[in-house]
Structures are given as structure tokens and as C-alpha cells.
Amino acid sequence: MSMTTETSTNKIQVRDLNFYYGKFHALKNITLDIAANQVTAFIGPSGCGKSTLLRTLNKMYQLYPEQRAEGDILLDGNNILTDKQDIALLRAKVGMVFQKPTPFPMSIYDNIAFGVRLFEKLSRADMDERVQWALTKAALWQETKDKLHQSGYSLSGGQQQRLCIARGIAIRPDVLLLDEPCSALDPISTGRIEELISELKKDYTVVIVTHNMQQAARCSDHTAFMYLGELIEFSDTDTLFTAPRQKQTEDYITGRYG
């Protein structure tokens, strides 16, 4: 299905995207625009394809030979689905945070510095500054500044997820993908992540997958509702939740789905 937003700047343009797990047709003719420096949410029931769509945006599926995408995904006008796309550079520009916190088995400091070292050669002073900058952006600096050399595993679940966000933005990407980042967190940690998402859009284009419709309503500027691999409706978030155009969307957001 084709749905585009009316905005002066689109960071990502998805055109006629189809995706396959082997012979299974998981995404069907998806077309949508993702606006720069805004938060776009993908919602829908389990198995609808929202996480699959998210993972096409940095070609995460290429880790699995049986998975393939067809169509076009334009990032700043360049089609990332071509064979010429440098995967390492793509993932530097399009960072990802997963459902469960995934700190590396190393210190808090090195969790942040690890990715930076892959792309930049910084002096120790500059690296210290980058680590502080990333942790500050992720609202974690005050909680970690006196224990940077402790293990990332020493942090609470909510802190670990903010560490993963800090790690993702440390390499200064353009886009940040969040795959259900709060599903394993308590309400207080969830609230802090949601506040952080609102702050991050000042500097990044943010795309979030969530099962929590209230979270999508609170955090996002645009929302896409998906069902069985199809894009059913895509609009600004207020419109989708208060005046949906499609009955399927209305049934889902009012709890009459199924």
C-alpha cells in the first residue's frame, strides 16, 4: 500500500517494498515517507511485519541468507537496497536499539567507545569528550560519571537500555531505530526512555516499533498501522488515533481487533 506524508523534508522514502523470509511474503508493497527529525511509530498486532519493516531500514536482514527485500528504500535520496551500498557505513548512519538491553561485556566507557573506534581515530581526550556527550544525550551521565570503568552489566535494566541508546548515538548517526525499546522495562524506566525519545528527535530521525498504543500516541509525530504485512494506514499520530480513516485501524486502537 502507498502512503506518504506531506512534509518538506523526508529522511527515508520507502517505495514498493516487498520482503520475503524464504518463500513467505512478509511485507507487501509498502510505500511510505519517514520525516526527518520527527518520531515515526509502527504499530500493529504480533506478526504484522512492523519489526521486519524496521530492520529493512538498515538491512539487518542481510545477516540471514534466506531473507531478501525487493523495491526501493531511499536514505537522503540514495537507494540502500542496491548491492553497492556499504553496509558498515549504512549502519553507522542508521543506528539500532533492540527490544532487550544488549550491553557489550565490557565497561560502560568501552560500550560507548567501541563503535566510535570502528569509524574514527580520536585522541583519549576527544574520546572522553565523546563518551560524556553520548551519555549526557542519553540522560545517563550523572548516573555513571563516577563508575565509567564498571561493567555495563552493573547497571539496572532501564540504565542498560539508555546505555545502548548512548552507544547508538555515539557514532553520530542520522537515524535511530528502536525496536520495542521499553517492552522489558518497568514503568519508571519506560517514562525516562519516552522522555529521551522526545529529546532525541531534535538531532535524529527516530523510528520506533511498539506494541503499546499509548506509547505511540505519547511519543510519535506519525504512526503507521500494519496488519498481515500490509500498511493499512499511515498519518500524523493525532489523526490516526482520533479520526482513523480505516475501520481496521479503528477496531485495533479501540480494542475491537480480532
UniProtKB/Swiss-Prot annotation:
GO biological process, one term: phosphate ion transmembrane transport
Reactions the enzyme catalyzes: phosphate(out) + ATP + H2O = ADP + 2 phosphate(in) + H(+)
UniProt xrefs under InterPro entries: AAA+_ATPase (IPR003593), ABC_transporter-like_ATP-bd (IPR003439), ABC_transporter-like_CS (IPR017871), P-loop_NTPase (IPR027417), PstB-like (IPR005670)
Keyword ATP-binding among UniProt keywords: yes
Enzyme Commission code: 7.3.2.1
Subcellular location: Cell inner membrane
Name of the top EC class for this enzyme: translocase
Membrane topology, from the record: Peripheral membrane protein
Pfam families in the record: ABC_tran
Organism superkingdom: Bacteria
Domain ABC transporter span(s) in chain numbering: 12-253
Keywords for this protein: ATP-binding, Cell inner membrane, Cell membrane, Membrane, Nucleotide-binding, Phosphate transport, Translocase, Transport
CDD domains: ABC_PstB_phosphate_transporter
PROSITE patterns the UniProt entry points to: ABC_TRANSPORTER_1 (PS00211), ABC_TRANSPORTER_2 (PS50893), PSTB (PS51238)
GO molecular function, one term: ATPase-coupled phosphate ion transmembrane transporter activity
Its job: Part of the ABC transporter complex PstSACB involved in phosphate import. Responsible for energy coupling to the transport system.
Assembly notes: The complex is composed of two ATP-binding proteins (PstB), two transmembrane proteins (PstC and PstA) and a solute-binding protein (PstS).
Name of this chain's protein: Phosphate import ATP-binding protein PstB 2
Source organism of this protein record: Pectobacterium atrosepticum (strain SCRI 1043 / ATCC BAA-672) (Erwinia carotovora subsp. atroseptica)
Top-level taxonomy: Bacteria, Pseudomonadati, Pseudomonadota, Gammaproteobacteria, Enterobacterales
